From Swiss-Prot:
Residues 49-105 are annotated as: Disordered. Coiled coil: none annotated. InterPro entries: MAGE, MAGE_N, MAGE_WH1, MAGE_WH2, MHD_dom. Residues 108-307 form the MAGE domain. The lineage of its organism: Eukaryota, Metazoa, Chordata, Craniata, Vertebrata. It comes from Canis lupus familiaris (Dog). This is Melanoma-associated antigen B10. PANTHER family: MELANOMA-ASSOCIATED ANTIGEN B10, MELANOMA-ASSOCIATED ANTIGEN MAGE ANTIGEN.
Length: 378
């Protein structure tokens, strides 16, 4: 076979392989990086100590923030097998949750997870985050690895909870956590402990986007099973997942959950809701998914092209809205100017009428004064 044809065949094979891998794109969140903070409840929590401004690490199930300290390593093959075995159309609440194999962790891995807990605590308390505080309360003797630990913790926060860590004061090294959604999703749907659920929502939106903007319920549950969420099984962060995604998120209009037409027995599917379109975009969701794969959105040409088209349509809609607003403002300004002009004209007319009336009255008064009095008859 000629060399050129071999090269083309290799290229075609590679593209086909990439397409196959993309079919389970979001399932990559079952890797250890996400499993460290997603799969099982933690015995580790941060709480305020009596000394103002200091924090301590305590053991036990109670605490302000409780996230996973047990990493889970789930291979791509095992994830699919688990999903196939666990997904049902309407799983029973007695469904047993598969146990994840322990994933060996070193000291730096432990520090990453502890830093995630610490940052979530600060987010819950609505407090600024300082480098000094992270070094003092979490990093400690591993300060030479601070940047590596912070980078990995930031990735966890983004992929699992949908939070971005941003430095707001480079001189003092002050940071804040910012929700990836534009509006107040966390304030509305966070649980009692203030743990954000934006990452889960972005994951589901990603599944819908990558399945042609409409995902079968089974496809969504396959991905959620991979990251440790099962219908009917109470989750330590998200509560009962089925209620969350088929009721809460639907009620808040982030998701649309509908029966597939003419399906017997009934089957259901998910679409983006109007608030999802308003508060995020296909490009933002694709950027989120790309980070899961440690790549860039353009690595997925078909979805990237669709996201670019969506961005262009949004830009045109914003431009049209601005033009409409400007036209309305201009019309109101003209109306006000016209009304003001009419007011001035009417006022001038009234003033002239008053002047004319006063002039006539003055003339009459003078005329009366100049007429001599009639003499009395004797």
């Amino acid at each position: 076979m000629p060399r050129g044809q071999k090269s083309k065949l290799r290229a075609c094979k590679k593209r086909r392989q990439v397409r196959e891998e993309l079919q389970d794109l979001v399932g990559a969140q079952a890797t250890a990086a996400v499993g460290e903070v997603f799969h099982s409840p933690s015995s580790l929590c941060f709480k305020s100590s009596p000394a103002a401004g200091s924090y301590s690490v305590s053991q036990g199930p109670q605490g302000a923030i409780s996230t996973s300290t047990t990493a889970a390593s789930v291979s791509h093959t095992r994830s699919n097998e688990s999903a196939d075995n666990q997904v049902e159309e309407r799983p029973r609440s007695s469904q047993a949750q598969p146990t994840a194999e322990p994933f060996p962790r070193g000291p730096l891995d432990e520090k990453v997870v502890k830093l995630v807990h610490y940052l979530l605590y600060k987010y819950q308390m609505k407090e600024l985050i300082s480098k000094a505080g992270m070094l003092r309360n979490v990093i400690q003797m591993y300060r030479n690895h601070f940047h590596e630990i912070l980078k990995r913790a930031s990735e966890h926060l983004e992929l699992v909870f949908g939070l971005d860590l941003k430095e707001v004061d480079p001189n003092r090294h002050i940071y804040v956590l910012v929700n990836k959604l534009e509006l107040s999703y966390d304030a509305m749907l966070s649980d009692d402990e203030g743990v954000p659920k934006t990452g889960l929502l972005m994951t589901i939106l990603g599944v819908i986007f990558t399945k042609g903007n409409c995902a079968a319920e089974e496809q969504v549950w396959q991905v959620l099973n991979v990251i440790g969420l099962y219908a009917g099984m109470e989750h330590f962060i998200f509560g009962e997942p089925r209620k969350l995604i088929t009721e809460d998120l639907v009620k808040e209009e982030y998701l649309e959950y509908r029966q597939v037409a003419n399906s017997d027995p009934p089957r259901y599917e998910f679409l983006w809701g109007p608030r999802a379109y308003a508060e995020t975009s296909k490009m933002k969701v694709l950027e989120f998914l790309a980070k899961v794969h440690y790549t860039v959105p353009s690595a997925f040409p078909a979805w990237y092209e669709e996201a670019l088209q969506d961005e262009e349509e949004r830009a045109q809609a914003r431009a049209a809205a601005r033009a409409h607003t400007a036209a309305m403002a201009s019309a109101r300004a003209r109306a006000m100017t016209s009304a003001h002009s009419k007011g001035i004209t009417n006022e001038h007319s009234r003033a002239m009428t008053n002047v004319h009336s006063r002039a006539i009255a003055s003339v009459r008064s003078k005329a009366t004064q100049t007429i001599p009095p009639t003499p009395n008859k004797v």
